[in-house]
């Protein structure tokens, strides 16, 4: 990789991480009883008083400040592991929530009832952005056993390039490339639909 390209990629990743640290919260504010896996974490701020710009990520319940490359690197650098929180790390890698929302809105007539128990588009987009397992999705979206089976079959179909499970649920032919792409992305970026 050439040096300018490496710098561009590094800058892009740093910008995404800083945006996450500065402006986004993990959790479901505005909803009354989120499941334990989605309990809202305190908003992390860029360069809190006791952190400097070189180490802007403040660990929860600790005076420790981390460099951005230490966040979501597979090792607990914060005492309680807040730098490796599943929802934080999943959300950093996944497509933007607004992109998931736009996708869902375009497919809402067949995808929401068949895969997500007719849940609200905003809620489904947020859950897909942060969920780590099928258990997370099931508990927050109140999925039925049939929804879970449909999600698993649809994801399996997307992974192997077989649209038939989705077409059986009412997916229009023209939607296949977009549906396949998103389901594969979510799966490849950590949404384990086979884990409870």
UniProtKB/Swiss-Prot annotation:
SMART domains according to UniProt: LDLa
Tissue specificity remark: Expressed by the venom duct.
Cellular compartment(s): Secreted
Classification via InterPro entries: LDL_receptor-like_sf, LDLR_class-A_CS, LDrepeatLR_classA_rpt
Primary location class: secreted
GO cellular component terms attached to this protein's record: extracellular region
Protein name stated in the entry: Neuropeptide prohormone-4
Species per Swiss-Prot/TrEMBL record: Conus victoriae
């Amino acid at each position: 990789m050439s040096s300018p390209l490496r710098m561009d990629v590094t800058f892009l990743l740093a910008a995404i991480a800083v945006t996450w640290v500065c402006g986004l919260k993990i959790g479901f504010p505005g909803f009354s009883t989120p499941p334990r896996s989605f309990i809202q974490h305190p908003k992390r701020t860029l360069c809190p008083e006791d952190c400097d710009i070189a180490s802007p990520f403040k660990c929860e319940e600790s005076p420790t400040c981390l460099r951005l490359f230490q966040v979501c690197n597979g090792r607990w650098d914060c005492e309680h592991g807040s730098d490796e929180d599943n929802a934080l790390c999943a959300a950093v890698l996944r497509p933007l929530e607004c992109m998931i929302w736009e996708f869902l809105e375009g497919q809402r007539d067949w995808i929401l009832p068949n895969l997500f128990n007719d849940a609200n588009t905003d809620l489904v987009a947020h859950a897909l952005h942060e969920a780590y397992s099928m258990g997370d999705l099931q508990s927050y979206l109140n999925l039925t056993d049939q929804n879970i089976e449909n999600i698993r079959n649809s994801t399996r179909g997307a992974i192997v390039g077989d649209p038939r499970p989705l077409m059986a649920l009412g997916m229009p032919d023209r939607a296949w490339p977009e549906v396949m792409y998103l389901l594969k992305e979510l799966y490849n970026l950590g949404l384990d639909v086979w884990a409870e």
